[in-house]
């Protein structure tokens, strides 16, 4: 008998306490518990209300531009087959979330949370952001619905993501640079939580990933699951069957969970998540929580975290501001321990190679975040048979990264 027998379904979590096995839960200040419970009830009510689903679908179609295309990356497929033994080399598809309004998958979740905030009568929205994509999506939806928007962003990220900072301000958001700690995503989330405790009556906290206290990990996953639901349908239409493998990058892990969740019980579908290895996991300068971390509690949930010997949260590093987080969503931690998803990591250097290759071969400049996953597609695809169907979640476009990448390549803009 195995200690962790595979469950009948990988899609039933979390339990009523918000746990995925030993992960998840809600470790929050007493002040926040009433808010969390209100949110849980409001979300349960919204899920049961056909008008909420109808609004999600209507705005998804007419405002976001869903469904996003599933695209056969023909030249990348040919390029990798040329390096593979005869008869090898997977057929590669991109789920093109970068074509959504605002340029990434983030808007799927924000739409759901903003519609929920309106149902709850909360006129002030706060959010944390790393790469700025979640901040831009939140500012965008707040502008659309006439809500006040405050975005917390680490001061380091404010510098390296200047185009997105300007976008948020153009959309009417107040952007607050966070100077504490490492001045990145973790610290932005800390400040947003402090704000929420202080302004409980009128404020809704729009979390950007599948982390935080319950019900956030499940709620964000549900709003992002449109990615996987569409992929299933599109692949059946294009190829007459399900894909053989899925691959996505992971910071907190919402784009990955959105793609993965609808496929978790399709046991023949291989699933790969790709963390940020920075300068290499052995260097200590990385953001690969599953590869280089251990279980602990941060931002209201128990999950895998980067910690030092004393249990203090360690600094994360990634070339990509959106993956520069010392933790991972609790459902990913559980799927890792259950063995359902294989978690890999990609270095900054591997990511830049993939970024260049995708741009040159497909005419698509990817964000640095999905370029991490793309680097593992370049490794995995040549090892698979030619009939193998592989789907990459192209979760964001690279416009925001052009100044940073140009600087790395020694170009002056």
UniProtKB/Swiss-Prot annotation:
Residues bearing N6-(pyridoxal phosphate)lysine are 106
Kindly list the cofactors needed.
pyridoxal 5'-phosphate
Question: Main EC class of this protein?
Answer: lyase
Q: What are the UniProt keywords, alphabetically?
A: Amino-acid biosynthesis, Aromatic amino acid biosynthesis, Lyase, Pyridoxal phosphate, Tryptophan biosynthesis
Q: Assembly and partners?
A: Tetramer of two alpha and two beta chains.
Record-stated family: Belongs to the TrpB family.
- Function, in words: The beta subunit is responsible for the synthesis of L-tryptophan from indole and L-serine.
Query: What is this protein's name?
Result: Tryptophan synthase beta chain
Upper taxonomic lineage: Bacteria, Pseudomonadati, Pseudomonadota, Alphaproteobacteria, Hyphomicrobiales
**Gene symbol?**
trpB
